[in-house]
Amino acid sequence: MGVITRVNELRSERGWTQAQLATEAGVSRQTINSIETGRFEPSLTLALKLARLFDTPVETIFQLAGER
């Protein structure tokens, strides 16, 4: 079962680049790109960091596929 992510949507709403988000989250731009394209599922730690940066619950950012 995969994960559906709203990282791209939330990042774009805020006018942030992948590089800006990556710097704030302490990861590479490639990691953010891989999360946004569904090639990489973030660790719990990274998911929580992103939730804090977006000021939104983690379950709003990430959902299991088929649970929408």
Predicted regions and their residues:
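A detector for short, charged/polar N-terminal pre-domain segments
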Residues: M1-G2
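Recognition helix of helix-turn-helix/homeodomain-like DNA-binding domains
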Residues: V27-F40
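Short, charged recognition helix plus adjacent turn
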Residues: R52, F62-R68
